[in-house]
């Protein structure tokens, strides 16, 4: 009986570990953990119609400042 419980415990641990490793949680890219920056980068991506603009805006400050300039004009 104890061996079955040990096997089940090990299987549960393996499944839990794999679930955390292959989780599909949408984590913010780069500096887009900040809500304001995230919203601005999304707006700039929509306006620019460039697929990778959001990622660039979240990672690079220069692209973020270009985004701010785009929204000012």
From Swiss-Prot:
Its main location: secreted. Inhibits voltage-gated potassium channels. Disulfide bonds join 32-58, 41-57, 44-67. Keywords: Disulfide bond, Ion channel impairing toxin, Neurotoxin, Potassium channel impairing toxin, Secreted, Signal, Toxin, Voltage-gated potassium channel impairing toxin. Expressed by the venom gland. Belongs to the scoloptoxin family. The keyword Secreted applies. It is found in: Secreted. It comes from Scolopendra mutilans (Chinese red-headed centipede). This is Kappa-scoloptoxin(03)-Ssm1c.
